[in-house]
Amino acid sequence: MAEYDLTTKIAHFLDRHLVFPLLEFLSVKEIYNEHELLHGKLDLLSDTNMVDFAMDVYRNLFPDKEIPNSLREKRTTVVAQLKQLQSETEPIVKVFEDPETTRQMQSTRDGRMLFDYLADKHGFRQEYLDTLYRYAKFQYECGNYSGAAEYLYFFRVLVPATDRNALNSLWGKLASEILMQNWEAAMEDLTRLRETIDNNTVSSPLQSLQQRTWLIHWSLFVFFNHPKGRDNIIELFLYQPQYLNAIQTMCPHILRYLTTAVITNKDVRKRRQVLKDLVKVIQQESYTYKDPITEFVECLYVNFDFDSAQKKLRECEAVLVNDFFLVACLEDFIENARLFIFETFCRIHQCISIGMLADKLNMTPEEAERWIVNLIRNARLDAKIDSKLGHVVMGNNAISPYQQVIEKTKSLSFRSQMLAMNIEKKQSNANRNETPNWAAQDAGFY
């Protein structure tokens, strides 16, 4: 299913360390030639300090060849650099291991006050922060993500937002937590990084767009693993104009993930309202990006073409199974997609043949009847089944005019506030901001 694989597009907006899990997934799925994937891993590893990993990949790629001297020499260099940085950082680490320092860090919110305390009690100096940052970055490049996260936490607590490495340290901390699969910590870091980007009033519009595009792609790891992720992705991607603009301008392929989050959302009332807004975006962007997942929504809610929707749903299954971020959503997606087909069909027909419905849902009549019974039992459907005639008779579920007005206007206040905020930010924009440049981010993935 390489036709719909987005790994190459997504990798352009990821740090190279974040690409490795995607390549491992592709290797398991056997979508691409294994030899090509190993070459890709080796290329990615060339600009990292994960030399042992590179040697393992080289052995798998060239089992009959000796490990190149260049890799052996690089390993010697990396070990020497690590020892040097460890000796430089040892007195700094001892300061943070002190119980009194730990208590002070937990109780003090002000980084300047904490720095002054450390300077007074332990002779802490400004250059220690640069050493700590270099050591954290080196640990990250070696693949020691837990060490990197720990030292970057210390660094973040102490440096002001104006520090030249402050923004990079946030990117590094987020990447480290993602790679350790610490989703609670990663969600906190993602929120912190987003606030930093959104509140930076001195960046150019192009720099802000670039930063948000990176954040959108990195956030996929968090949103599709954190329990509240599918709610948060809708809020950020669909209802934050700056991020929706970034998706429409730079990465319309992200609509696949937004659409999946909407379809698999467990809040039925919210899902129905969100679907209306999503359909508008999918229609607007259909000329720049489409895949079976976005086309399923278009077939069902724009064209009301149930046969095409059923066909696209079968294609969606193949797309989901082979997508690193979405494979865990497969069951929820298929279940809710069938419900969407059913609900839309029921709005048009008051009385429906179970046989016809089974055909539309790609189920046997017995499976379809059991499925509908479960919907009625779980209060997700106002309907009755006539078993003799094999019909489903829909209940009267009319919405009052007052409720219709409330549904149509309840999001206007929020959108007006966001519009006002964006106008204020544009008026105060100046000329400077740093682009995300953590660890091995380079032109190859930028």
Swiss-Prot record:
Q: Which GO terms describe its molecular function?
A: translation initiation factor activity
Q: Where is the composition biased (Polar residues)?
A: 428-438
Question: Which biological processes are named by the entry's GO terms?
Answer: formation of cytoplasmic translation initiation complex; translational initiation
Recorded hits in InterPro entries, A to Z, give:
eIF3e (IPR016650), eIF3e_N (IPR019010), PCI_dom (IPR000717), WH_DNA-bd_sf (IPR036390)
The entry's cellular-component GO terms read:
eukaryotic 43S preinitiation complex; eukaryotic 48S preinitiation complex; eukaryotic translation initiation factor 3 complex; eukaryotic translation initiation factor 3 complex, eIF3e; nucleus
Q: What does the UniProt entry say about where the protein is found?
A: Cytoplasm; Nucleus
Q: What happens when the gene is disrupted?
A: Reduced melanisation 2 in embryos 2 days post-fertilization (dpf), misplaced pigment cells in the tail at 3 dpf, and abnormal jaw morphogenesis at 4 dpf and 5 dpf.
Q: Which SUPFAM superfamilies match?
A: Winged helix' DNA-binding domain (SSF46785)
Pfam families per record: eIF3_N (PF09440), EIF3E_C (PF21357), PCI (PF01399)
Record's keyword terms, sorted: Cytoplasm, Initiation factor, Nucleus, Protein biosynthesis
Q: Which residues form the PCI domain?
A: 222-399
Q: Where is this region: Disordered?
A: 426-446
Role = Component of the eukaryotic translation initiation factor 3 (eIF-3) complex, which is involved in protein synthesis of a specialized repertoire of mRNAs and, together with other initiation factors, stimulates binding of mRNA and methionyl-tRNAi to the 40S ribosome. The eIF-3 complex specifically targets and initiates translation of a subset of mRNAs involved in cell proliferation.
Q: How does it assemble?
A: Component of the eukaryotic translation initiation factor 3 (eIF-3) complex, which is composed of 13 subunits: eif3a, eif3b, eif3c, eif3d, eif3e, eif3f, eif3g, eif3h, eif3i, eif3j, eif3k, eif3l and eif3m.
Q: Which family does it belong to?
A: Belongs to the eIF-3 subunit E family.
| PANTHER family recorded | EUKARYOTIC TRANSLATION INITIATION FACTOR 3 SUBUNIT E
Report the protein name in the record: Eukaryotic translation initiation factor 3 subunit E-A
List the source organism.
Answer: Danio rerio
Taxonomy, top ranks, is: Eukaryota, Metazoa, Chordata, Craniata, Vertebrata
Name of the coding gene: eif3ea
